[in-house]
Structure formats: C-alpha cells, structure tokens
C-alpha cells in the first residue's frame, strides 16, 4: 500500500452548495486520481472491524461504504421545483477543491464550514488534519507546519481529484473547469465524475427511472460521487500523530509519549471531542498514522453496506428529500477492466440493486429502532465470535446509528425483525423466487430475504403494531438519549475492546434442528442477565454460526458481490447538533444496568463479567446450566466433566454443578454472601451489617474493648489471669451451645435471610456455609494469625495476605483501599512493638476493624482478631514481618534468631492451603496441591450452602 497523504481542502464557495455525502473507500495508488471520498465511520464500527481482524487473525477483506447524513448549520435552503421524475430530487453539490500534504497520515476529506456569497468565487483552503479553514494558502502552509509536517505540499481538487504541485495551476483548473458547470449542475440536480482513467473533470446528469423511492446503486467500474441535501459528514479528525522518531504526539495539547498504551491513557482527556475517536491499533509494529489506510482491501472484492431511508418523508430543516448514489471503486492494479455482469435485484418493498461478482457474505444489523430493539455490544461481539475464522474473506459489519441528544423517544425508526424460519416453511405467498439464467430476482412481499435456508425479515411501518403484540415492547429501563461524559466514553471504549478480545471463542454448538425453536420469538424466554429483545438478537447471532460453516448456508449468496438492504422507516427528524460521543448507546446501557445493580460500585471486572456472561448465555440459561448441553462428559479422561462455557474440568460431577454457578448472575441487590435479595441499596446495606463484625466487647476489668470475643478472652486470660469459663461469663452476649472438641459449629437460623447460618463455637463468627466456619475454626488452633474473611485463607505473613486479597478485587462489596490500609497498619504496628508485651500488641492492632457504613466490612481484613496466640507466637510473627518488603528495618534471620529467647519461634514465608492446611515454601507446589480442592474452593468463594449443592445433584 502506498503512503497516503494528509489533505488540506481548496474549495470554491458557491451559493447553491448545500451538502455532500462522502464514503470511505480504497486509497488510490496514485495521487493523480483519487477515486473515492472517505467519511468517518461509526467509532463502534471501527472498533469492531479492528477487533474482528485480531480475533480472526487475518487481514481485512472489506472496505465499508457507509452513507451518512448530517445537517449543515449554516447552509441556506433553496426551494427547487421538483421535476417530473420517478426518483426523489436531490440538491446540487459543488464539491470543494483540496490541498494535499505528504505525511504518514491517512487521507481524509473535509467539507467546508462556511459558504461564500451567492455571486463570485472564493478559494478556501482547509487542513485535513484538523478543522482549520483559511482563504489564504500561505496561512494554511504555516498552519500545516504546526503539525510537524515539513514535506512538500501537494494540491488536490476534491471535485475530480486532480493533483498538482502548483497553486496557480490548480486554481486555474478550479475556475475554468468548475465555474461554468455550477449552474448546469444546479438545474440538473445530479452529477457524477467520469472513469478514473480520465484526467479531466467531466460531469453528466444521471437519472434512475426504475426506482420510485430512494435509489441506491452500486457500480464496480466507475468512481463515485454521493449527493444529498445535507452537508457532508466530517471526515476523521487525526488528533494524534506518529512522529518519525518513534513518538506519539497529541495534536490537541502537544502531549508526547513513546508507547501506545500511554496514548490510550491520555485519550481520557479528549474523549468528549466531536471528532476524537479512541485510538485502536491494528498491531504493535504498524505506525499509528496508517490507521485509516488499513481498511484498504487486498486483491478481492469490495463489500458495501448502504442504509437507505424508506418511502416515508425525511425532514431535514425543511429541506428536500435525499437521493443517494454510491459506486464502489475497482481495483486499479488490474490492467484490463472487468466485464459487466448481470445485476440481481432484491425488492424488500423498496428498491435494492446488487452486483454479483463477490463471494463474501454481508450481515447488516441496524440499531436505529432503539426503543423497540435496544442495540447491544453483546450482539456485535457474538457475531465476531461466531464467524468462522477459516472462511477467507468473510465479513461481519455492524452498522449503528448514533441518536442525537435532541431526538425524541417517540420517533418511528426502521425496525429489524428477527423472526427466523426454515426456508422450506416459506409459503409461496410470502416470497416469489424467479430464476432466469444468471439473473436471479427475489421478490419478498413480506420483507424477507432467503439466506441459506434462513429467512430474515425487516418489518415495515405496517408491521410494527403486530410486532408489539408479539412481545417486543418498549423497554422502560432503556436510558434516555443523552451525551456521555468523557470518562464514560473512554471507559466503555476500553471495555468494548477488552471484552471482544477476551471473549471465549468457543460458542454454543447449535444444529440446524435448533433453528425452528429459535425462530419463534415467543419461545425465547428472558434471561436473567439480558432483556428479551437482546436474547432474540443473540439467538440470531448464534443461528448464523452453523450456517456459515455449512455447505448450503451460502448458496443463495455465492454469486453476490455486495448486499444492499433498504430498510423502511417512518418520518425521522434530524437535529442540528452532532452527538459528542465515541460509541453506541448500547454500552452505556450495560454500564447503567450495572450501576443500578451495584449502587455505583461497579468495577471494570463487573462489566466485563456482564459482557461475557451475556455472550455465553442461552435462552433460559438457569435451567440449561444443569443440562447436558453445558456439561460435556469425556470418557476415559482424568477429568471427564468439562464446562462448555469455559475451560474448567473436574472429576466430580458435584463440583461441576457448583462451578456452573459462576456463569449464573446475581439478582439486583442480592447479597454476595447469602441468597438474600434486598429491595434497594439501603436495604442491602442494612442487611450487610448482619454479616459484619461490628460488635464491641468491653472488658469488665479495664477500659479496653475489642471487636472479637476471642480477643477479649485472650486479653482477660493474659492480662487479668482469668480462666476461660470466667471470660465466657463476663462477655456481653449469651452463648449458644458449643462443641469445642472437634471445632464443630452450631447451626442457627438467620432472621434476615432464609439461609441457614453456622456459628463458630469459639467466637461469634457466622457463615452461611459449613466449610466457611470450618476454615475459620482453624484460626483458633493454628499459628497463622492472618486470614481472609472472604474465603478463609490463613497465613502468617501480612504481605502474603495482601497478595491474596487481589483475588477478590472483583467482588462487588470489596473495598481494596480499606483492606490494604488495614494490612499496612498491622504491619507497621507489629513492626514498632518489637520487644513490647504481646498484650499491647493486641491492643494496638485492634484498630483494624471493618467499616459498617460502607457495607464491606465482611471483606475487610482485621488482623487484630487473629493475633490471639501465645506470646512466643505473636512475637515470632512480628519478627517475621521485619523481613517483609514493606518494613523499613532490615534484620537478618541470624540477628532475629540471636535476639529471640530460646523458647521463641520465628516464622518464615509459607504458602498455606486454605482447605486442609498444607504448607509449602514454594508457590508452585501449593498451586499443584490446590488442584485437589477445586470444587471446595468454588464453593467457598461463592459462599453457597454445601447441602444445597448436594441437592442439585
């Protein structure tokens, strides 16, 4: 691919100039002739296209041509008499001339922001790197130098893409060739450039008399111009540059960095800019400046996606209706022109024209019917996942329209109906298929298209009421159209990219026999993690997966060059403003659902978990989790039971049942420790206090108080020489029967939940699982004074506990800052009390309590409750902490051994198994050992009742 050039526009201003619609295409290998104009695609489309290349590990085979509309704020409307033509007339477009600059930047065209007066010609120069517009060429040259570009300037006329290095020569070309043609084009209301082999700019008037509605045509042999009544879509604004010396530079604030990840982080500051898109890099060794040019296709066809407005009236500031003509460019490297083939017409109550020269299949999903079918990144991700990586040239294109903030929710838009039936069930009245030689004409009276035995329908405005009766009701939880904040935009960009890359490639295996079930919308039950309409779209994505691999799945499209679909819609108002947003509203819907669920405590891991669960889910997933279609049995294997949703394997069927709970989401405001479901966030916070250690135990002999009864008992025994029986008698809480011999626990009922509660017989620790209390009980019988309150992990080294707590960072009510502070305080305090009495050590460390207000005190690690061992054990632990990296002192083992009395023990860093107490100085040995307890670990983390798990068998 040849090095592209940045563009500065040289534009002749004309009064009748109304609008222009540009399209993104293949960059010409010669600067003499540029065949197509490029427009900025939807950022979400850009993200998905880039990530689909990563997932499929192949080069891009597509070049999307996406027609967009955008009203011009300063364009004056002119009422022109409609000619007696079949098509809807369009305004004349006088395309501007341009100034081009050589650099390592992709070529981008911009339309003028200002219009000259009706009389006379004014040359304007516009920089392609930003929006800067000037009537002086010298001023623009100085401006371009500010971008760090020092190469020579190349001028280009954007009307016919003729290039020249002489300013006078190109200005004369614009005046002579385009001045007299303006009036002719105004009267004819249409224009088109000639073949790319011509160096002159000629214009012809073209009419499409066969199409009564909006004509959309694709021609493989000619370059194109696109006409519309609205002003052209602004091209991609290159807000970052890749310097020759290997540095990335932000053009907004001149920020420079040497790594791509630093530039992505810096993009937070500019996420709200209109033309600022989140940087997505194709690969690490590709220069950043070649981002746009990466869309150029290898030898192969060009896939075009065109969304046309239906027969309903389109209102753009009282302007005329729209005519769109798009022609895809040919491969300029071919020496001989391609032969014109017969065209295939597909009529979906609108006119659609196709060219049959390509083998790629195009899938189009429109989300403009946002209120009836909320769009979803999950559907986009699933379409990328379900696409066959072995099919060369297969293209997945997701088309989304960003609604303006001023658009009302009651507007009628085009709706994509996902009713799917087997091709054999299609009645003759629904579709009439005629085949004559190489010309295949499909007439679908019911707005259906036959794609490899699969019927996909797009409903017109008459079918909307019928669809509403079938259950596609407006979602009340859908957020209103609003502009996202900078942090939301960039955070969602990151999550979209991360989720699509990390999504599991293995999709649910569906057969052709399953298509009949998914075809009926009424049979699709709502999933706990997804709305019903999203489940319908997800089912459509999964249905397409087996069809792509089947031999008969693409028979109806094997000869199709590109697929153009006209989607009817109702009247649509287009506002003046442009949405300052980076991606679609669907991602905002996902994050707002999680925000409502977790009361603004959702983390990135929660959102990624939401995306992955929704992508993995199937209709009625709660019941299917226990079915054989999710658990795969592999005979003669060491671990015969395998989860289809992930890579988990187990030799015990009960353990795999427990593991499946990982893929089941919690209900809104459900307690993460037990099964209690609160009504709101305040109710959940009040409930969480029952799981927290918030009670204060006052010593009857002195002024000291403790958060745990075991601390009080040890304090009274060591400081006041009281026996254990007296300690129990002086406590503030009556005891329930205990069994101290084996450390067994007492079962009791919890008023706040229907779950059974297990209580420790030594202290008042309670848990909903027997295993949790059993692991807790080891604290009173071991010399490991630090424990994890989430899973029962115990250790004698505070840094080990700090490292362990990262495993629970995704917990909804986990407060890492609070836990980390408590551990650091325990380390610093225990380091300062070397040589002091163990009693004072316990008193000072008792400050590490949980915060009952935040509702996360169950997750907070309190080291004081565990420092209740003998004096030798406590002092030994303190000496071990002297060796920790977080301690300021640097005593060696020899010094500690010499300072310690003969009866004192000192600890070394050990890795402890939280299930059976196995210890090892090697972390690898512990990980190998922990494989034996996979099922129990899952049970502990999920805090589920062991008896309930056995009942599910």
Swiss-Prot record:
Q: Which Pfam families match?
A: zf-C2H2 (PF00096)
What Gene3D superfamilies would the database entry show?
Classic Zinc Finger
Q: Where are the zinc fingers (C2H2-type)?
A: 125-147, 155-185, 248-270, 641-663, 669-691, 697-720, 758-780, 786-808, 911-933
Cellular localisation: Nucleus
Disordered, as annotated region: 470-489, 831-891
For this record, an example GO cellular component is:
nucleus
- Kindly list the GO molecular function terms attached to this UniProt entry: DNA binding; zinc ion binding
Q: Where is the composition biased (Polar residues)?
A: 854-891
InterPro entries per record: Zinc_finger/UBP_domain (IPR050688), Znf_C2H2_sf (IPR036236), Znf_C2H2_type (IPR013087)
Give the record's keywords alphabetically.
DNA-binding, Metal-binding, Nucleus, Phosphoprotein, Repeat, Transcription, Transcription regulation, Zinc, Zinc-finger
Major place of residence: nucleus
Q: Which residues carry this modification: Phosphoserine?
A: 95, 427
Q: Which GO terms describe its biological process?
A: positive regulation of transcription by RNA polymerase II
Report the family membership: Belongs to the krueppel C2H2-type zinc-finger protein family.
Recorded hits in PANTHER family, A to Z, give:
ZINC FINGER PROTEIN (PTHR24403), ZINC FINGER PROTEIN 507 (PTHR24403:SF74)
Q: What does this protein do?
A: May be involved in transcriptional regulation.
Q: What is this protein called?
A: Zinc finger protein 507
Q: What is the species listed in this Swiss-Prot or TrEMBL entry?
A: Pongo abelii (Sumatran orangutan)
């Amino acid at each position: 691919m040849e090095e592209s050039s940045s563009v500065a526009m040289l534009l002749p201003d004309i009064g009748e100039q109304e609008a222009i619609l540009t399209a993104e295409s293949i960059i010409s290998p010669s600067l003499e002739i540029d065949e197509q104009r490029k427009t900025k695609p939807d950022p979400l489309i850009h993200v998905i296209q880039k990530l689909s290349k990563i997932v499929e590990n192949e080069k891009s085979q597509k070049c999307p041509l996406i027609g967009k509309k955008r009203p011009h704020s300063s364009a004056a409307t002119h009422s022109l008499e409609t000619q007696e033509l079949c098509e809807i007339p369009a305004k004349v477009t006088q395309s501007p001339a341009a100034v081009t600059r050589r650099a390592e930047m992709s070529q981008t065209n911009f339309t003028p922001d200002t219009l000259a007066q009706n009389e006379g010609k004014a040359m304007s120069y516009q920089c392609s790197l930003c929006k800067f517009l000037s009537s002086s060429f010298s001023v623009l040259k100085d401006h371009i130098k500010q971008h760090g570009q020092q190469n020579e300037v190349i001028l280009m006329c954007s009307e016919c893409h003729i290039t020249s290095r002489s300013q006078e020569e190109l200005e004369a070309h614009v005046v002579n060739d385009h001045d007299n043609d303006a009036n002719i084009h105004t009267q004819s209301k249409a224009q088109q450039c000639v073949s790319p082999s011509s160096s002159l700019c000629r214009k012809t008037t073209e009419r499409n008399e066969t199409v009564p509605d909006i004509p959309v045509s694709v021609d493989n042999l000619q370059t194109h111009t696109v006409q519309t009544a609205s002003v052209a879509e602004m091209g991609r604004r290159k807000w970052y540059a890749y310097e020759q010396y290997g540095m990335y530079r932000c053009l907004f604030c001149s920020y420079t960095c040497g790594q791509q990840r630093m530039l992505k982080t810096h993009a937070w500051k500019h996420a709200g800019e209109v033309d600022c898109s989140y940087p997505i890099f194709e690969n690490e060794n590709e220069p950043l400046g070649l981002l746009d040019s990466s869309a150029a296709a290898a030898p192969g066809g060009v896939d075009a996606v065109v969304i046309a407005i239906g027969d309903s009236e389109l209102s753009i500031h009282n302007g005329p209706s729209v005519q769109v003509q798009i022609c895809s460019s040919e491969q300029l490297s071919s020496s001989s022109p391609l032969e014109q083939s017969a065209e295939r017409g597909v009529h979906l109550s609108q006119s659609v024209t196709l060219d049959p020269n390509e083998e790629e299949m195009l899938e189009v999903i429109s989300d403009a019917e946002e209120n009836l079918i909320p769009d979803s990144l999950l559907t986009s991700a699933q379409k990328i996942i379900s696409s066959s990586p072995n099919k060369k040239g297969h293209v997945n294109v997701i088309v989304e329209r960003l609604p303006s903030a001023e658009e009302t929710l009651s507007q009628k838009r085009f709706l994509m109906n996902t009713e799917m039936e087997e091709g054999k069930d299609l009645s003759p009245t629904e579709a009439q298929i005629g085949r004559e030689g190489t010309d295949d004409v499909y007439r679908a009276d019911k707005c259906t298209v036959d794609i490899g035995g699969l019927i996909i329908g797009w409903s017109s405005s008459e079918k909307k009421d019928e669809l509403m009766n079938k259950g596609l009701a407006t979602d009340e939880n859908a957020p209103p159209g609003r502009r996202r904040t900078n942090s939301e935009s960039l955070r969602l960009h990151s999550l979209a990219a991360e989720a699509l890359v990390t999504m599991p490639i293995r999709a649910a295996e569906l057969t052709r026999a399953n298509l009949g079930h998914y075809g009926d919308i009424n049979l699709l039950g709502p999933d706990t993690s997804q709305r019903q309409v999203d489940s319908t779209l997800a089912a459509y994505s999964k249905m397409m997966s087996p069809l792509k691999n089947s031999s008969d799945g693409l028979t109806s499209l094997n000869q199709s060059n590109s697929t153009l679909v006209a989607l009817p819609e109702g009247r649509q108002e287009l506002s003046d403003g442009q949405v300052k947003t980076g991606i679609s509203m669907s991602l905002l819907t996902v994050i707002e659902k999680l925000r409502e669920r977790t009361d603004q405590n959702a983390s990135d891991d929660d959102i990624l978990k939401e995306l992955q669960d929704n992508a993995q889910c199937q209709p009625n997933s709660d019941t299917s989790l226990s079915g054989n279609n999710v658990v795969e049995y592999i005979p003669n294997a060491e671990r015969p039971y395998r989860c289809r949703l992930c890579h988990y394997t187990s030799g015990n069927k009960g353990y795999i049942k427990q593991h499946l709970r990982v893929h089941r989401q919690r209900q809104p405001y459900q307690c993460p420790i037990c099964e209690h479901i609160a009504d709101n966030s305040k109710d959940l916070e009040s409930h969480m206090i029952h799981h927290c250690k918030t009670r204060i135990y006052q010593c009857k002999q002195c002024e000291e108080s403790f958060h745990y009864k075991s601390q009080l008992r040890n304090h009274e025994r060591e400081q006041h020489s009281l026996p254990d029986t007296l300690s129990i008698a002086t406590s503030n809480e009556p005891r329930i029967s205990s069994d101290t011999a084996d450390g067994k626990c007492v079962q009791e009922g919890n008023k706040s939940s229907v779950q059974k509660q297990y209580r420790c017989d030594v202290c008042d620790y309670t848990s909903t699982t027997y295993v949790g209390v059993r692991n807790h009980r080891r604290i009173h019988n071991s010399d490991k004074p630090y424990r994890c309150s989430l899973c029962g992990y115990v250790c004698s080294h505070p840094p080990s506990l700090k490292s362990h707590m990262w495993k629970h960072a995704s917990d909804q009510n986990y407060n890492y800052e609070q836990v980390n502070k408590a551990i650091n305080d325990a380390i610093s305090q225990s380091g300062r009390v070397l040589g002091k009495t163990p009693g004072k050590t316990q008193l000072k460390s008792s400050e590490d309590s949980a915060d009952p207000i935040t509702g996360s005190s169950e997750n907070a690690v309190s080291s004081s409750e565990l420092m209740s061992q003998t004096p030798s054990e406590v002092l030994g632990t303190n000496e071990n902490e002297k060796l920790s990296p977080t301690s300021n002192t640097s005593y060696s083992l020899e010094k500690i051994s010499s300072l310690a009395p003969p009866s004192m023990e000192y600890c070394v860093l050990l890795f402890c198994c939280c299930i059976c107490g196995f210890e090892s100085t090697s972390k690898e040995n512990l990980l190998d050992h922990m494989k034996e307890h996979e099922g129990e670990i899952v049970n502990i983390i999920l805090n589920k009742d062991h008896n309930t798990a056995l009942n599910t068998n």
